[in-house]
């Protein structure tokens, strides 16, 4: 669908150096589809967002009679990637820690801030509050108490927010480590590891370019991902793939202090790329080639006849 670069699955990046020809068809859920060019395989490449839900729902009937194999055919699974629904999927899980996330109106938040409404039992202070639809930490704040929430709301212009309890996931050295992982055909591939001394970790502000020590650790994590992180969390990652029934999606996650997988977000449109400076990040080229190769193999595999 039309939108910014985070609105859709980054197919241009995922098909880097492949021999595939990419035909992108933008849909809005209202305009009749044009004549579809001949193709070998299709993929639903729309990310979860409020304005995506009707578009995705409109595709369900169309895809039932699509003349070619379709990846991420389960449009309801994409719709269900909202932060609140994803947290509900794992509320009973012993393997995946997905802090319960509620979608609350500005009015309810004001009532919590003024103590007119009690905090939901699923939540506890400090809270993480972010506007619905926001990304990359925009307007995301850790709120210590009702007074801090009042201050936050004084500049809050949105109608709704996602609210979750904060989980301290600092490692023993005081650093916070956030992993971005692509789940491709139910197999995990590490896209990056960001390391920061701040709880709100984003790769671009984590100082990775400025620290050889951090880059060395990321290189080590990539080199030994399969027998390291992926093996430690094999059962948790399998549960993720079962609950989120998609051929391709990605997650941002960490490890809790007791060694469990802490899920921050799951999305089909998370940015995965190979644009980092190769002289500074020489280890990323082989890793991203492996990830992109897996995605391209997923497309090719969809063309193969299914065997019982």
List the predicted regions and their residue ranges.
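Short glycine-rich anion-binding loops that position phosphate/pyrophosphate groups of nucleotides
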Residues: 47-50, 132-134, 269
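Short, solvent-exposed loop/turn elements at beta->coil junctions and helix N-caps
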Residues: 30, 166-171, 253-254
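C-terminal active-site "lid" helix and adjoining low-complexity regulatory extension at the edge
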Residues: 242-246, 255-308
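Active-site nucleotide/adenylate-binding loops and adjacent lid/helix of ATP-dependent enzymes
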Residues: 39, 75-177, 208, 231, ...
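Phosphate-binding site of ATP-dependent enzymes
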Residues: 141-236, 240
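Protein kinase-like catalytic core scaffold
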Residues: 127, 189-190, 249, 262-265
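Conserved N-proximal alpha/beta basic substrate-recognition cap immediately N-terminal to
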Residues: 3-110
């Amino acid at each position: 669908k039309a939108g910014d670069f985070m609105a859709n699955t980054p197919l241009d990046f995922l098909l880097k150096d492949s021999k595939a020809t990419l035909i992108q068809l933008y849909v809005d859920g209202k305009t009749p589809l044009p004549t579809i060019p001949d193709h070998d395989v299709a993929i639903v490449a729309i990310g979860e967002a409020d304005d995506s839900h009707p578009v995705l729902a409109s595709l369900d009937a169309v895809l039932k009679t699509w003349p070619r194999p379709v990846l991420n055919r389960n449009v309801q699974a994409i719709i269900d990637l909202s932060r609140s629904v994803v947290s509900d999927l794992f509320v009973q899980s012993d393997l995946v820690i997905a802090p319960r996330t509620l979608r609350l109106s500005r009015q309810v938040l004001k009532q919590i801030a003024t103590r007119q409404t009690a905090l939901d039992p699923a939540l506890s202070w400090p809270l993480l509050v972010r506007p619905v639809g926001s990304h990359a930490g925009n307007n995301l704040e850790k709120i210590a108490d009702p007074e801090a929430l009042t201050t936050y709301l004084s500049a809050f212009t949105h109608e709704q927010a996602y609210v979750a309890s904060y989980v301290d996931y600092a490692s023993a050295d005081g650093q916070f480590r956030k992993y971005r992982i692509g789940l491709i055909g139910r197999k995990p591939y590490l896209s990056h590891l960001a390391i920061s001394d701040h709880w709100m970790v984003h790769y671009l502000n984590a100082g990775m370019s400025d620290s050889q020590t951090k880059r060395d650790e990321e290189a080590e994590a990539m080199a030994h991902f399969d027998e390291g992180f992926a093996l430690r969390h094999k059962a948790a990652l399998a549960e993720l793939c079962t609950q989120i029934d998609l051929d391709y999606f990605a997650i941002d996650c960490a490890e809790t202090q007791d060694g469990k997988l802490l899920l921050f977000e799951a999305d089909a449109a998370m940015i995965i790329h190979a644009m980092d400076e190769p002289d500074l990040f020489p280890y990323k080229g082989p890793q991203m080639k492996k990830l992109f190769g897996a995605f391209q193999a997923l497309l090719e595999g969809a063309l193969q006849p299914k065997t019982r």
